[in-house]
Amino acid sequence: MESEFFSEIVQTIIQQKLSKSQATKLKLKLCSKHKLKRVPTDIEIMLRAEEQNIPSLKRVLQTKPTRSISGVAVVAIMCKPHKCPHGRCTVCPGGLDSEFGDVPQSYTGKEPATMRALRHDFDPYLQVFNRLEQYIVTGHMPDKIELIIMGGTFPSMDKRYQTGFVKYALKAMNDFSSMFFRKNNLNLQKFKEFFELPGPVGDEKRIDSITRRLKKVKLSDSSLAHEQKRNESSNIKCVGMTVETRPDYGRTSNGIFALSLGATRVELGVESVFDDVLDKIDRGHDVQEIIDSSRELRDLGFKLNFHYMLGLPGSSEKKDIEGFKILFENPDFRPDMLKIYP
């Protein structure tokens, strides 16, 4: 049914020389006729069209995908699984040798970003490239990227690894731009050819073919400073970068290094504002460490996103509510953002 839909809409748009509004009405009508479960984006229609028909379709359909509503597209990538510097908290599900296998700290391996990372062996270049491809195919223009580096306490990892990880994440954005954009417009035909589209999403042969080509591009010589400079004029710009850390690794020295990588926000693993609760889950630091870390990171200019957990051992509903009041009434805390975990 899908193939019949795409064939009919392409032929009708070209033969009847429809306007944009007419094409939109036709799309809805044909979706009903062919019993499609969702309405394809304009770019999906062009991806399904023959090369000779694309110029005619471009005059009717949008020439490039729409932006995300906020104007910024989030790209979340995972660093490789590594041991937490203090050991494992009692409530942490992931990490090396966990019941879920070797997965990033604090994750189960079932999250979309984790599954994407596992597919690409935690390679930042491949993770970013894959996410950018997904954005284009689903009709979004990822020209402004907020990069979120997940997977545990990133500042605890070897500084060479951190540098290389960010370098290749930025290189993926820059290479994607230089490969598929011409005069600020997406070269749809080149994009189709490189990613072998349209094609089955989970086809291993297709994935292997694309991965081999990407690895060849990735290996060209570069440095973090070079990729940061390239990104200033890239069509895919990194406008924000987030790293995750425990408070005891979120101090001034690590903060300064994170700034050199380009980080603008820190997701801080606060979890609780009560020493007895932190002690009960073997957190390995106290509330004062959270306060000191928050102050030092703010002084460096970072925005702070606290991770906070409810229902921890040693806590209660009443204590959780009290904790929220402390978070927002006490000036030692007051995060810019908050992630709540059960």
Predicted features along the sequence, with ranges:
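Flexible, acidic/Gly-rich N-terminal and inter-domain linker regions that tether
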Residues: M1-V217
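Gly/lys/ser-thr-rich phosphate-binding loops in alpha/beta enzymes
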Residues: R67-D97, G311-M337, P342
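Short, functional N-terminal and low-complexity linear motifs
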Residues: I54-R59, V91-F100, L132-H140, D221-L224, ...
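Conserved non-cysteine loop/helix-boundary elements of the Radical SAM core domain that shape
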Residues: K110-L126, L147, G151-M173, F181-N305, ...
